[in-house]
Amino acid sequence: MRAKPFLELGKVRIYNEDFLETEAIEPDSIDLTVTSPPYNVDIKYGSYDDGIPYDEYLEFSRKWLRKCHDLTKDDGRLCLNVPLDKNKGGAQSVFADLTIIAKEVGWKYYATVIWNEQNISRRTAWGSWMSASAPYVIAPVEVIVVLYKKSWEKTHEGISDIAEDELIEWTDGVWNFSGESKRRIGHPSPFPVELPKRCIKLFSYVGETVLDPFLGSGTTLIACLERGRAGIGVEINREYCKLAAKRVRNTGAQTKLEEVIGPLGSLTREETPRKR
């Protein structure tokens, strides 16, 4: 039985469910997924154990990546924001491992974007101080792995809202912008709206459907509203659903929702829509 949306606002919907169990999304209906799954670094989410054994984490990742693949159209894409690696609880090559699993369940690899978040958490660690005994290496970057289901090239025409300067800068492969403040957003691991905004404008047409299976504070749906995409967010934690709903409502009011949900409502005068 399909659950009712926690929030439905125009073409944006939030579901308070476990993504692995939800039946709210039709197979082969998603054009683009933009998400940052749990990192398994013991972040206190409230309703999810973010410190499980690594093999269990990889199996969990396999399940959700497979389901996401099933929900995606043949020319659909996935932008997967994950850490390059992790050191807490033992060094693990998260980016490499999840990329391998994604390919094993059917995703095809396209590219990797390096996100230089400029050390938002101000992390510092040295391990063995001034000694070769056991020094730590910290990567102050994350990655966005770009994958696709069957066809990288879109099989239909649509309207792109990306500007020329954005296209040139964003296809460079190294993105430099700051991370988001936990305190300001009220979520233990938010990403800035700049991240989904770039993915959405670069990899989807206006009016297409974007999914975030780990919605968190709702940032992906905010970008959907601002850029004229339909958006579906799934979040297991009810308190985070409330937070996401509040942020989405505020964004809807600020961007005049009745215009944004139209196919060209979010385009500025400076942007020239074009078919690709």
PLM segments and residue spans:
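Core catalytic lobe of class I
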Residues: 1-243, 273-276
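Terminal low-complexity, poorly structured segments
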Residues: 3-5, 239, 253, 260-263
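Conserved SAM/SAH-binding loop
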Residues: 16-22, 260-267
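Short, flexible loop/turn segments with low-complexity composition
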Residues: 157-161, 255-265
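C-terminal helical cap(s) of enzyme catalytic domains, especially alpha/beta-barrels
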Residues: 241, 245-255
